[in-house]
Amino acid sequence: MNLILFGPPAAGKGTQAKRLVEQRRMVQLSTGDMLRAAIASGSELGQRVSGIMERGELVSDAIVIELIEQRLPEAEAAGGAIFDGFPRTLAQAEALDAMLAGRGRRIDLVVRLKVDDAALMQRIAGRFAESGRADDNPESFKVRLDAYNRQTAPLLPYYEGQGKLVEVDGMGSIDQVAAAIDAALTGAAA
């Protein structure tokens, strides 16, 4: 099964993806984690994307598509992938569909975590205080949320038109959200 966790920054995508990795033995393909690892390694790629991410801007389609393509064989071996933070643009969604189709696979389900902006701001403040992640400062977060609303949220009709979109209330506890995602996955597998 290939699943996209969709939602604004701080909606809980990473939290839910980690739980699914443990319970369903899927591979989490988080472009944010991959990009942060590149920055931490000091690689040429990391140096190129560091400033972009600190400003809260989106990294180019070409870079994130390349990162995902490198990790797809690992996901296939595990029996499925959880795409977290990808795709973020229509070009990325179309590239992902083409990559998977070339391997005889497809996106099975897109779960949109719905969380209101006030709760997102509260979550990001807590996460920034805990992690100190450069892209979690309030200014960068506002840029990221705006980028999500302008560039990523418009993907919803793309997946809705394919009959793959399920909306989950992301305002509940971690366990409540997990139960709703599990119900959606069970329905998609039936």
From Swiss-Prot:
Q: Which GO terms describe its biological process?
A: AMP salvage
Pfam families from the xrefs?
ADK (PF00406)
Any one of the GO CC terms: cytoplasm
Q: Where is the stretch described as NMP? A: 30-59
Keyword field contains Magnesium: no
Quaternary data:
Monomer.
Protein name as annotated: Adenylate kinase
Q: Which gene encodes it?
A: adk
